């Protein structure tokens, strides 16, 4: 299957995701990792060389822009935007990091079991969450996207073969219960995976609280009623304290409201300097202020 990614700069080109704990470990704690608590620190010569090369390329920007057409200018601008972001990242790597009491270099993970059984997916999710949490604690990253299962999920209940996506369409609604029992069982197990994700963030002590107290996690499904791919009542959750900015523990029912309001709320709670979000009829400047402290 083609890997799923929601990380994009242009809306058309998406970043390649790390699909295994080992790949994520190498990205966060592999070559070039600078332990913020190490007494011995010096700039990485390889980073200095890369910064020098990027600076030389950037200096040629104006010459290139004058010699190409409008369509190529757009492509070049995207390219140079990526270069500027990379230069900023390299500049950070050349600065001595501030000490981080919560940062502990994790052990290299073992090769995970590869199966679509939701219990296996949840175990792998916990491993990935542990690495991501320590990546935040060590200031290796401040924002990330994580996909537990894709929109057409191929996970299944242990011991069975019928996949989640197929069950949502084939299973009838129980006459007495008023819902789909097997679908609900799978949804419950997926939420257990989300709970495990939060537990790993909450397990790291940071200051007077935990890492989760200082973070915000925005989680969502892509349908409200999967059987018919309904876009009404899509479940969206905000977890974590966001450094005291998030008033958690509330259920807000907002029928007919744009889901982009929740996205805008999450970004503002996380400290992003953004006043509106979305496109066309989904564009909004109204965050959900009920959850803002």
Which residues fall in each region the model found?
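Ligand-binding pockets and gating/stacking loops
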Residues: 1-293
């Amino acid at each position: 299957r083609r890997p799923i990614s929601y990380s994009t700069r242009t809306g058309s080109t998406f970043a390649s995701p790390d699909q295994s704990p080992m790949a994520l470990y190498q990205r966060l704690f592999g070559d070039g990792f600078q332990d913020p608590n190490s007494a011995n620190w010096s700039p990485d010569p390889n980073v200095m060389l890369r910064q020098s090369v990027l600076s030389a390329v950037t200096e040629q920007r104006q010459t290139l822009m004058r010699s190409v057409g409008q369509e190529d200018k757009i492509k070049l601008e995207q390219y140079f935007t990526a270069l500027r972001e990379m230069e900023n990242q390299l500049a950070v790597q050349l600065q001595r990091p501030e000490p981080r009491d919560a940062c502990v270099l994790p052990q290299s993970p073992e090769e995970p079991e590869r199966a679509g059984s939701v219990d296996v997916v949840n175990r792998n999710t916990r491993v990935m969450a542990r690495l991501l949490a320590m990546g935040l604690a060590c200031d290796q990253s401040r924002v990330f996207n994580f996909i537990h299962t894709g929109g057409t999920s191929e996970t299944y209940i242990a011991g069975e073969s019928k996949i989640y996506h197929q069950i949502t369409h084939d299973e009838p609604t129980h006459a007495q219960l008023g819902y789909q029992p097997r679908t609900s069982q799978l949804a419950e197990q997926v939420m257990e995976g989300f709970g495990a994700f939060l537990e790993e963030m909450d397990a790291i002590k940071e200051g007077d609280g935990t890492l989760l107290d200082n973070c915000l996690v925005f989680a969502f499904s892509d349908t409200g009623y999967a059987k018919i791919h309904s876009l009404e009542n899509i479940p969206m959750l905000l977890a974590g304290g966001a450094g005291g900015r998030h008033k958690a523990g509330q259920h807000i029912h907002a029928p007919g409201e744009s889901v982009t309001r929740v996205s805008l709320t999450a970004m503002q709670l996380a400290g992003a300097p953004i006043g509106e979000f979305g496109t066309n009829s989904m564009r909004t400047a109204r965050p959900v202020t009920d959850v803002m402290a």
